[in-house]
Amino acid sequence: SSAASDVYKRQLDQTQDFFMDGGKNVRPASDENVRNNIAGIGRIIQEANCDVQFLQEVDKSSKRSYFVDQTASLSSLIGGTNAFAVNYSSQYVPFPLPTIGKVQSGLLTLSSFGALKAERIALTGTYTWPVRVAQLKRCLLVERVPLEGSDKELVLINLHLEAYDDGDAKQIQTEELLKLLTTEYEKGNYCIAGGDFNQMFSEVDATKYPLIDSSYWQAGTLSSDILPEGWRFAVDDSAPTCRLLNQPYSGDRAKTQFYVIDGFIVSPNVEVEAVHVIETDFQYTDHNPVKLEAVLKK
């Protein structure tokens, strides 16, 4: 079986920057811009030809994406089942100027397998009231796929961990993720978790995508030491998985801050055959998809 994490962040394409990353903009220039980017992302999804897609930051009804229902556009692409878990829902986000306004956004999992059930599991956040009212409520989207001739399940977890915190929330959320994964594995289930960890991986060569300016957002590092024996990260650093949105992307790689923060965790009974970043040159979004090909061990 194969699974892919296609990670999309507000469909901010090559021409965009974003205020939280040091840029100026809150949203793309027009709804046409949003629709073009969604169409481009759709083509990438279809070309990747995966059984499962983990998508993050998919808007259902948000001012920032001109109220285009992206879940509807993307859900029809590969057939099978789809599940959506909201992690950002606010009637009005009062910052910056112009304001973000209404947001309804979350995680979308597309599966050609047909899942038994899908469940939203809340993760611990560290924002306090009133700030948390206008912040993301991080979660995991967990799907269970029955396996023929077995009482075990394939447990698929779509994730997007905290971004702009001091590191505490990410650490807590990572621990919560690992606790869930190990519990499922101990039942004999097969586990694949994937998405945007907002952290670099210790397997990645840190000199490949160094911090080029000390004022830029710096990702913490996820050490493989935190994984129980036999578990592994499935990541690839042949291309970056994300760019900083402090400025539009000119294609000048020397002046662009890159990261490898997207990938997978797999249980010991899942054999990784290949994992690679699909290089899209950030044409439609500020993340590159990561494709995992894996086999469930008998």
Q: Predicted segments — roles?
A:
Residues S1-F95, T99-Q104, K298:
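N-terminal, active-site-proximal structural segment of metallo-dependent hydrolase catalytic domains
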Residues S2-D6, N37-F67, L110, E143, ...:
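Active-site beta-strand/loop signature of hydrolases that rely on acidic residues for catalysis
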Residues K24-S30, V58-K60, T124-V133, H160-D168:
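Surface-exposed cleft-lining segments at the edges of enzyme active sites
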Residues S75-I78, K102-A118, V145-P146, K255-E271, ...:
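Conserved beta strand-loop-helix elements of the APE1-like EEP
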Residues N82-S89, A118-T124, V275-I278:
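Conserved S-adenosyl-L-methionine
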Residues Q91, F95-L154:
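A well-ordered secondary-structure block
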Residues R144, D168, K179-I192, N198-K298:
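Metal-dependent phosphoester-hydrolase catalytic domains
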